[in-house]
Amino acid sequence: MNKILIAAASSGTGKTTITLGIMHALKKRGLRVQPFKVGPDYIDTNYHQAITGVASINLDSFLIDDDAMLATLFQKHGESADISVIEGVMGLFDGLGIDRDNSSTSFIAKCTKTPVILVVDGKAISTSAAAIVDGFNRFDPELTIAGVIINRVASENHFSLIKGAIERYTDVPVLGYLPKNAAVALPERHLGLVPKEEMTELETKWELLGDLIAEHVDLDRLLAISKTGAKLTVHPPEIQVPDFSGVRVAYALDAAFHFYYQDNLDFIRSTGATLIPFSPLEEREVPDADFIYIGGGFPEVFAEQLAKNKSMRESILAAHEQGKPIYAECGGLMYLGSSLEMEAESYEMVGVFDGVSKMTTRLRKFGYCIAEPLEDTLLGKKGTAIRGHEFHHSVFETTEPTRMKLTKKRDGKIVKEWHGGYQKGNTFASYLHIHFYQNLLIITHMFGAIER
């Protein structure tokens, strides 16, 4: 199994840009590329899929606290590809707290036995780049940097300086560089990169990026490195897949709602259930289904269009009033509230919950947490520990009672506690994003609410 992992010294170094360029260049060579993303991010994975034509898979060692399960999922998705390309998150050793193996890119590299390519920012640096590479290469005796790519290089002369320094003072090969070019920069907004659903002329950007990588990076050497990763010996955990044949699951999928982990959707299908996508933006009513799943996204960007689609809002509210189970995450919670406010405007939403979503100028919640239902809910029974991730620039102001206690820990200590999650009838919504493979009984529990 050929595999590489693209890591960096820190966020903002150009890791995503380099990764996308490599994926495009390899695909242009006729290779089937299986993309992966370390961590819980949804937007990078959308970009990966746009370029490779293959669904990108999240590898998150906090959301899935089971090394064997992570390795199994990696092997399962990568075994039919010509090469697996993993994009890291933050800096190589950054994770939860100061433990270099706690939810970090380096841990995923070791768990999957994947060679690491380090992206180094070349802006305003020369010989000091060698110190960065040397430090990263020595930091963890169990991990070796297999190659380096330099980003934001001013000229061939500049690249020669950096390459010469790294290869003189370390034994890590420099595979090439990406020159400074504003045309390949990726636009950002409050949740990170702007999703592909909202960007035009993407193909032109990808084409240019892929051509630059093909011109300035030694892809043959990179492919040779991808063959050096140790063979992954997988011991798949025993999985009891429940039988939900005949169950119809309608899930919101459009430019406003598209934050889903591919493995979550795949697992639902593996139970025999049928997934039916629908658009709260474009369609008049929710499809005939036994269960409704509304993931996260950017409802605030499309608030006016969502508000104008009154028939869809009424359709979802009617499904709730009929007792149909509805599960919603983050943007889905905002949609199920009574209204969404932004820039002095108020937009009517579905109205399952009596609450107002208000956009904020700063990040309100960010990071991993463990949720514990305070009573039996659609998400889980009272006291069940559920791992999740929150990341939002909004607050949900409501008098509805909260149904979960959420705890954020760092290095074994509780650093924050709060309450969230709302249940009314058979509808549950919260800001929490979860991965079903942490505990496959989550789906068994949620689908157990379906009248069959």
Curated annotation (Swiss-Prot):
Alphabetical list of Pfam families matching this protein: CbiA, GATase_3
Active site: C330
Record keywords: ATP-binding, Cobalamin biosynthesis, Glutamine amidotransferase, Ligase, Magnesium, Nucleotide-binding
GO molecular-function term, one example from the UniProt record: cobyrinic acid a,c-diamide synthase activity
Top-rank lineage group of the source organism: Bacteria
Pathway: Cofactor biosynthesis; adenosylcobalamin biosynthesis; cob(II)yrinate a,c-diamide from sirohydrochlorin (anaerobic route): step 10/10
Listed GO biological process terms: cobalamin biosynthetic process
Cofactor(s) named in the record: Mg(2+)
Catalyzed chemical reaction(s): cob(II)yrinate + 2 L-glutamine + 2 ATP + 2 H2O = cob(II)yrinate a,c diamide + 2 L-glutamate + 2 ADP + 2 phosphate + 2 H(+)
Marked site positions, Increases nucleophilicity of active site Cys: H433
This enzyme's EC code(s): 6.3.5.11
Residues annotated as domain GATase cobBQ-type: 248-441
Note: The a and c carboxylates of cobyrinate are activated for nucleophilic attack via formation of a phosphorylated intermediate by ATP. CbiA catalyzes first the amidation of the c-carboxylate, and then that of the a-carboxylate.
The family this protein is said to belong to: Belongs to the CobB/CbiA family.
Function: Catalyzes the ATP-dependent amidation of the two carboxylate groups at positions a and c of cobyrinate, using either L-glutamine or ammonia as the nitrogen source.
Annotated domain remarks: Comprises of two domains. The C-terminal domain contains the binding site for glutamine and catalyzes the hydrolysis of this substrate to glutamate and ammonia. The N-terminal domain is anticipated to bind ATP and cobyrinate and catalyzes the ultimate synthesis of the diamide product. The ammonia produced via the glutaminase domain is probably translocated to the adjacent domain via a molecular tunnel, where it reacts with an activated intermediate.
Annotated protein name in UniProt: Cobyrinate a,c-diamide synthase
Organism expressing this protein natively: Listeria monocytogenes serotype 4b (strain F2365)
Gene responsible for this protein: cbiA
